[in-house]
Every structure is written in structure tokens, then in C-alpha cells.
Amino acid sequence: MAQVQMPVLETVRDNIGIAPFPEAKEHILEVKNLNIYYGEKRAVNDISMRIDKHAVTALIGPSGCGKSTFLRSINRMNDLIPSARTSGEIRYEGLNILDSNINVVNLRREIGMVFQKPNPFPKSIYSNITHALKYAGERRKSVLDEIVEESLTKAALWDEVKDRLHESALSLSGGQQQRLCIARTLAMKPEVLLLDEPASALDPISNAKIEELIVGLKEEYSIIIVTHNMQQASRISDQTAFFLNGDLIEYDRTEKIFMNPSEKKTEDYINGRFG
């Protein structure tokens, strides 16, 4: 299927005149000395790491360890929390997305997010995909039709819904709703997908479909997933970061994290001694 170009969607790079770092060739994100506070409480402590392009990076750790706060910082969702403040840098292909002159709306198109609980709009399946596109100015039906099919196909949902596109999205199963939410995000043509426990509320069969989908999507997107399911992290991710009490304890290839971790705290968590 031909790629659809949407000139109405300006990119972050088009909006900000900052030269990218040379290091951005192999890494799509570089985090430097990141601290995140809620009021006086520091939730993320001086984290530095690089995220590979076209890979799945898993963030693991016990509840309250800072992994979801860290994930939300990557497309500035924490800006929506009045008490939150951030210091340090998050460089997306060389651009510091924490700069005040970054267009946050455009940033969230390029770095899309899917949440734990499926949240389809109370609209038709078709309208769920096209809603943001129309808001951005795309009105051509032929273009919208193509994006709907392309996005639902990438989310492994097209064959299940192609004959019911104008039915309510709320009529779908939980697993189908979550894949619809992924398709809705893909319709905006992001570079990065942020997934906050996308399968935790689903049954085992739907969970397996989401995992299979994530592995396939990394060919085209860079994916960061928060998960409490360590088996899931070991199955689908290329790199794993272990967070504890706001600190990044260890970050390495997933195989090494699970088979031969360097830190005792990582080993204890992997082996279920706490968490």
C-alpha cells in the first residue's frame, strides 16, 4: 500500500531550528540527567540513557518506581500535572523536547502513547481513526479511507472489522479496543510508540495478540513499553531498564538483564525477592 503523505502535519524538526546531535544516528532518544518532581517529591532521579531506533525497550520495576512517570515525560504528558516539574534533557533525534519552544502538539504526533486501559472514543471504528486527522485538517475521503485501512492493518485489526467500520468502537472486545487505540495512534504516523502496560487489563489470548503486534511494529517504529509482567518483557523486548525508587538501577540487553544481571537489586527483583 502506498504511503500517504500528510503535509498538514508539521513535524517537530520542521518547527525547531536546532541541529541534531551526531549521536542521533543510532539512537532515537537520549536522556541526560533527567529529574522529575511532583511538588517537593522527586519521582525520577538523575536518569541518563539512550533508546535504540527500531527496537522494543521495556521498563520494569515495582509499583511507584518511576517507570510510568519516566515514560510520560518522553512526550511531555507530565505537563498536564500541575505539580510536576522536570529538569535535564530528553533529546529526540537530537532535539531537546523539554525546551520551552517545542510544539508539544506536534511532539505528541511524532511520539504517540497508548494507555493501560483501552479508551476508544464513543464513535464509530472509522471515526476513531479519522478524528485527529480531521482535526489536523485532512478532509479528503480517499486519503482518510486509505489511512484507516493502513492503520487497522498495521494493528492486526483490519480483517476483523473491515465490514463494520461504521459500528460503535464500544462494541469491540477489550483486546480489539486496545488494538484500535494502537491503530488510532499509528494513523498520526509517529516515529516512537509509548505503551503504558497495554496488555495488563486483557485476557491471555488478547495479551498474546498485543505482544505479537508489538514485535512486528518495531520494524517501523521505536517502541518503549512499561510492563509489570517480566515474562512479557523477556519475550518481546530488545533492551530492558530496571527502575527502583526513582533510580535507574540497570539498563542492558534484555537477555543479560534476565540471565546475568550486573546489579544485585536487579537479580533480587527478577527472582521475585521483592516487588
Swiss-Prot record:
Pfam families under this entry? Answer: ABC_tran (PF00005)
Q: Which SMART domains match?
A: AAA
Which EC number applies? 7.3.2.1
Where on this chain does ATP bind?
61-68
Domain (ABC transporter) ranges: 29-270
Q: Which GO terms describe its biological process?
A: phosphate ion transmembrane transport
Membrane topology, record value: Peripheral membrane protein
Enzyme class name: translocase
Q: Provide the alphabetized UniProt keywords.
A: ATP-binding, Cell membrane, Membrane, Nucleotide-binding, Phosphate transport, Translocase, Transport
Fetch the Gene3D superfamilies from UniProt.
P-loop containing nucleotide triphosphate hydrolases
User: Which InterPro entries does this one have?
Assistant: AAA+_ATPase, ABC_transporter-like_ATP-bd, ABC_transporter-like_CS, P-loop_NTPase, PstB-like
Subcellular localization, per the record?
A: Cell membrane
Task: Select a single GO molecular function from the record's annotations and give it.
Answer: ATPase-coupled phosphate ion transmembrane transporter activity
Q: Which PROSITE patterns match?
A: ABC_TRANSPORTER_1 (PS00211), ABC_TRANSPORTER_2 (PS50893), PSTB (PS51238)
Q: Which reaction does it catalyse?
A: phosphate(out) + ATP + H2O = ADP + 2 phosphate(in) + H(+)
**Which GO cellular component terms are attached?**
plasma membrane
Q: Which family does it belong to?
A: Belongs to the ABC transporter superfamily. Phosphate importer (TC 3.A.1.7) family.
The entry's function note states: Part of the ABC transporter complex PstSACB involved in phosphate import. Responsible for energy coupling to the transport system.
Quaternary structure annotation from Swiss-Prot or TrEMBL: The complex is composed of two ATP-binding proteins (PstB), two transmembrane proteins (PstC and PstA) and a solute-binding protein (PstS).
Name recorded for this polypeptide: Phosphate import ATP-binding protein PstB 2
**Protein source organism:** Bacillus licheniformis (strain ATCC 14580 / DSM 13 / JCM 2505 / CCUG 7422 / NBRC 12200 / NCIMB 9375 / NCTC 10341 / NRRL NRS-1264 / Gibson 46)
Q: Which gene encodes it?
A: pstB2
